[in-house]
């Protein structure tokens, strides 16, 4: 199943759906909205994750220009979707906008998602 993320338009809760049985996801008494990830980025700050695999480690950065990591504008989290499952890492203002994930032998990257607090979800 392709990874899907949903956001509540009232409180801002974000969830990742693990299994889809067709029942709407509800928060604050209303259905949550699916977040459709961007895949190309024409803005000055690059958001699309760029990943490489070296010796079983997935290295993730964001575009050709380093993304700001300020309290008002930063990458909140990164999610790695592989053939065997998912991993997620949180980032905080002031940190370098890079993460690494361990990849088990035989596993393969299917997608990498990054969530910017201002510009929403991005996918590579």
Regions found by a protein language model. Give the residues of each.
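Short cysteine-rich clusters marking metal-coordination/redox-active sites
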Residues: 8-11, 27, 116
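Residues immediately within or flanking Cys/His clusters that coordinate Zn2+
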Residues: 5, 24, 113
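Flanking scaffold residues of small Cys/His-coordinated metal-binding clusters
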Residues: 3, 19-22
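Short amphipathic, basic-aromatic surface patches that mediate peripheral association
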Residues: 62-70
